[in-house]
């Protein structure tokens, strides 16, 4: 500890006195295998590349303390490898570190020097470089994606392993273009995925996306935009921020971009930018007084002092972003202090000059003249920078690959001819190595999968501190209780174009953005499958749903059930009708020899009553679950008994018409045809004709059992479907004709005084028939299909009750209450006298 304090004091005193250091001469060390290094030790404030007419040198005027710290991290790692007895025993790694000035024209010079033949400054031209031995075995760096895209293609031609500690563009994962490129940072794709998941977690789907106008910003912005669109996040505005050294005309576009963002409802801005472009954007936003926003930062500028120390940054809003995790290097600050202290020691500097003659500075220029005037205070702010570990780990990755290539063990590395870069490259693929207890592995595309911390800027005095508020390791975790916002009451900002739709609603997009929409209710039979649906999903045919539903329910099988109230009422009506039929039939049988029964047709009247009872019983075919047999039997078992009933009534009406309207000579002849066997023959013919119609109906247009999924909102209806209205009407044709003839034969008949008016009963019976079935047709055609069987049952029973009430029940009343009228003169009249004189008796035979 005392020695460390002494070294620190020496460094402070030496640097404070303004004495030049020899730190730049510590950027090179000889070894059995040398690693090249490309670091942004300085930057050029005004490169003037557009005015460059000769391939001369570019002067780096501004010093970058972070670049120097990353270079020292590589230097420290090489020295640790050399001091370890297990990784490369008996061998010594060297390093050769150069400044890139963050410019391609500067980075290409040391890149060419790395590929020069060992021991010279020349690159020889060969048809085959298999046996070629360049100055370095592998290259660490560069830091930026823009430089890595250039140097990566160059080194890939020679299959020179290159491990970057900061280039994150996803284009570098292309193995066909960059077969020798590796990196100890994750691809921008991982960071973009984390950003999109963060927006989803916090409910922000209406954002602005801005990137720097360089490879890092353009590629990152493109990745983020495609991933955001795939996740339903809409980008209201998208733009690029020019780099500071571009023309003032292009820099003026920043104001227009900020104006668009300020005029919109966007409360969240994703800034995928390099440090210098981010500083430019915030300088303009502070000047233009942009309303505070949430800024989702990319890793490149999240921890940048250049941005953090910008005056007015505390007023821009909330800043949060993802920072790659890494293992701590607690010895690194003291190592930096040691390097600075040694650089101020003249004896140490003299020893470097003796050990490293011929630095070839006449070829590449001074390595880092600004490094010889650095202060410890200037470097202290970046001592704990997160990317220091990435530069440190890159050395260990190359060392482990060399260990595997040389087949080293605990006792040493077997002697062999020098390893060439392409041989080392073979052992870099899918390499697993450990750094500070952390296991790392290059995947098939040269990337390492690193976890991220979600960091939030929390302002303390003039500079923000980084608070960890979450993590991303393939899945996002956010610690909401640790979040703090710029809004009043520390409420989470809302950045949505439209409100979230409720349950059972889908989005109807307005314009070009899927996040701007109206909420539309899902109608019955459809449902909302997910909150992001644009269309309601139709339920399956065996399912149903109410309005604004989020699921479908199974349909219940339904039909005209026995227990339904309407069916129970009709069954009571059926019992009444059957009871009346049985009472009337019993009275007619009991009084079968009476004039009343004989005048009504005798046995034919009983037959007609029995058929009327069968008509009533036919309604029992309609309730219950329909089947093929019940569907086929419904109409024939209704119409055949009805034909039998109406045919007997037709004979009764014909007798009344003949006896009342025709001359006696004709009446006697026709009366004999309407009685006895001839009458039964007419009944049989009518039944046969109706049976033929029923047979044709069943063959040509058979009713079918139908499972109808859509006629009821929540149930599936099973019913018998009539296939033709014409065939249904023809089934009624014979019965309608018999009823019409009955009505026609009795309507105009004048009853004789002192005789029973049978014509009136038949007239009203036929009126009941026609009123029932004429009313049935429009009602049946327009009623819901679920109620059609009920309507037909009601029509059948009303028709039967109408005939009973108007024709049969009055006669039953006479048989029960007015027996004195049950005489031949009242019912038979002249027929009774004629039968009495002929001695034929009063009974029909």
UniProtKB/Swiss-Prot annotation:
The residues that the database entry marks as glycosylated are 128, 262
Signal sequence extent: 1-18
Q: Where in the cell is it found?
A: Cell membrane
InterPro entries in the record: ANF_lig-bd_rcpt, GPCR_3, GPCR_3_9-Cys_dom, GPCR_3_9-Cys_sf, GPCR_3_C, GPCR_3_Ca_sens_rcpt-rel, Peripla_BP_I
Q: Which residues lie on this side of the membrane: Extracellular?
A: 19-568, 623-637, 702-727, 782-789
- Which UniProt key words apply to this protein? Cell membrane, G-protein coupled receptor, Glycoprotein, Membrane, Receptor, Signal, Transducer, Transmembrane, Transmembrane helix
Q: Where are the transmembrane segments?
A: 569-589, 602-622, 638-658, 681-701, 728-748, 761-781, 790-810
Bilayer topology: Multi-pass membrane protein
Family in the record: Belongs to the G-protein coupled receptor 3 family. TAS1R subfamily.
Please give the function described in this protein's UniProt entry.
Putative taste receptor. TAS1R1/TAS1R3 responds to the umami taste stimulus (the taste of monosodium glutamate). TAS1R2/TAS1R3 recognizes diverse natural and synthetic sweeteners. TAS1R3 is essential for the recognition and response to the disaccharide trehalose. Sequence differences within and between species can significantly influence the selectivity and specificity of taste responses.
What quaternary arrangement does the UniProt entry report? Forms homodimers or heterodimers with TAS1R1 and TAS1R2.
Q: What PANTHER family does its record include?
A: CALCIUM-SENSING RECEPTOR-RELATED, TASTE RECEPTOR TYPE 1 MEMBER 3
- Indicate what this protein is called per its UniProt record: Taste receptor type 1 member 3
């Amino acid at each position: 500890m005392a020695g460390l304090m002494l070294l620190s004091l020496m460094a402070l005193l030496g640097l404070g006195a303004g004495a030049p250091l020899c730190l730049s001469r510590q950027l090179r060390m000889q070894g059995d295998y040398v690693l090249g290094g490309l670091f942004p030790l300085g930057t050029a404030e005004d490169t003037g590349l557009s005015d460059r007419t000769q391939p001369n040198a570019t002067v780096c005027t501004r010093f970058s303390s972070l670049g120097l710290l990353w270079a020292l991290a590589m230097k420290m790692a090489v020295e640790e490898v050399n001091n370890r007895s297990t990784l490369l025993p008996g061998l010594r790694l060297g390093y050769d570190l150069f400044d890139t000035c963050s410019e391609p024209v500067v980075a290409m010079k040391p890149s060419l020097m790395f590929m020069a033949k060992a021991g010279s400054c020349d690159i020889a031209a060969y048809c085959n470089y298999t046996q070629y031995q360049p100055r370095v075995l592998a290259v660490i760096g560069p830091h930026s994606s823009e430089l890595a895209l250039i140097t990566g293609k160059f080194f890939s031609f020679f299959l020179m392993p290159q491990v970057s500690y900061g280039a994150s563009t996803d284009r570098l994962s292309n193995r066909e273009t960059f077969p020798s490129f590796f990196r100890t940072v994750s691809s921008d794709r991982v960071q973009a995925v984390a950003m999109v998941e963060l927006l989803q977690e916090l409910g922000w789907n209406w954002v602005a996306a801005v990137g720097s106008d360089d490879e890092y910003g353009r590629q990152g912005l493109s990745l983020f935009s495609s991933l955001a669109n795939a996740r339903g996040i809409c980008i209201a505005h998208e733009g690029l921020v020019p780099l500071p050294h571009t023309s003032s005309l292009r820099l003026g576009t920043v104001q227009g971009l900020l104006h668009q963002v300020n005029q919109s409802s966007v409360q969240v801005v994703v800034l995928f930018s390099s440090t210098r472009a981010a500083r430019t954007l915030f300088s303009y936003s502070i000047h233009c007084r942009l309303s505070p926003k949430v800024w989702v930062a990319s890793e490149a500028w999240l921890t940048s002092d250049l941005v953090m120390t910008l005056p007015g940054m505390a007023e821009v809003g909330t800043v949060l972003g993802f920072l790659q995790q890494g293992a701590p290097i607690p010895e690194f600050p003291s190592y930096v202090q040691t390097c600075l202290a040694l650089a101020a020691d003249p004896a140490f500097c003299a020893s470097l000059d003796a050990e490293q003659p011929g630095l070839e500075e006449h070829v590449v220029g001074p390595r880092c003249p600004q490094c010889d005037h650095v202060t410890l205070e200037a470097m202290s702010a970046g001592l704990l920078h997160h990317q220091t570990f990435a530069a440190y780990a890159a050395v260990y990755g190359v060392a482990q690959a060399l260990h595997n290539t040389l087949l080293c063990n605990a006792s040493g590395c077997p002697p062999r001819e020098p390893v060439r870069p392409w041989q080392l490259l073979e052992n870099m693929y899918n390499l697993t190595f450990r750094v500070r207890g952390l296991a790392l592995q290059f995947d098939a595309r040269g990337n390492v999968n690193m976890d991220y911390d979600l960091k939030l800027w929390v302002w303390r005095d003039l500079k923000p501190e980084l608070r960890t508020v979450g993590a991303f390791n393939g899945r996002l975790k956010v610690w909401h209780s640790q979040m703090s916002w710029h809004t009043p009451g520390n409420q989470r900002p809302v950045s949505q174009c439209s409100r979230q739709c409720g349950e059972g609603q889908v989005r109807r997009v307005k314009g070009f953005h899927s996040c701007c929409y109206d909420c539309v209710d899902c109608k019955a039979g459809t449902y909302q499958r997910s909150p992001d649906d644009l269309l309601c999903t139709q339920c399956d045919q065996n399912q149903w749903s109410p309005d604004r539903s989020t699921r479908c329910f199974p349909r219940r099988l339904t039909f005209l059930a026995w227990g339904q109230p309407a069916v129970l009422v009709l069954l009571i009506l059926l019992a009444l009708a059957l009871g009346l039929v049985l009472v009337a039939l019993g009275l007619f049988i009991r009084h079968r020899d009476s004039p009343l029964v004989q005048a009504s047709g005798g046995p034919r009247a009983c037959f007609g009553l029995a058929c009327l009872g069968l008509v009533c019983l036919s309604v029992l075919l309609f309730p219950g679950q329909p089947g093929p047999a019940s569907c086929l039997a419904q109409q024939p078992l209704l119409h055949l008994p009805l034909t039998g009933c109406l045919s007997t009534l037709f004979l009764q009406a014909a007798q009344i018409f003949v006896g009342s309207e025709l001359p006696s000579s004709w009446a006697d002849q026709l009366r004999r045809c309407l009685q006895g066997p001839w009458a039964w023959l007419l009944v049989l013919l009518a039944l046969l004709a109706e049976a033929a119609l029923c047979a044709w109906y069943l063959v040509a247009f058979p009713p079918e059992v139908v499972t109808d999924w859509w006629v009821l909102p929540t149930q599936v209806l099973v019913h018998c479907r009539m296939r033709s209205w014409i065939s249904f009407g023809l089934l009624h044709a014979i019965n309608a004709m018999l009823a019409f003839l009955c009505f026609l034969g009795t309507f105009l008949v004048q009853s004789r005084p002192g005789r029973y008016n049978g014509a009136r009963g038949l007239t009203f019976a036929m009126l009941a028939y026609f009123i029932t079935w004429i009313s049935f047709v429009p009602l049946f055609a327009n009623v819901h299909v679920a109620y059609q069987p009920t309507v037909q049952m009601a029509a059948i029973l009303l028709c039967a009750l109408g005939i009973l009430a108007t024709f049969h029940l009055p006669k039953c009343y006479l048989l029960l209450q007015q027996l004195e009228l049950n005489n031949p003169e009242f019912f038979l009249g002249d027929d009774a006298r004629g039968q009495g004189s002929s001695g034929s008796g009063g009974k029909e035979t």
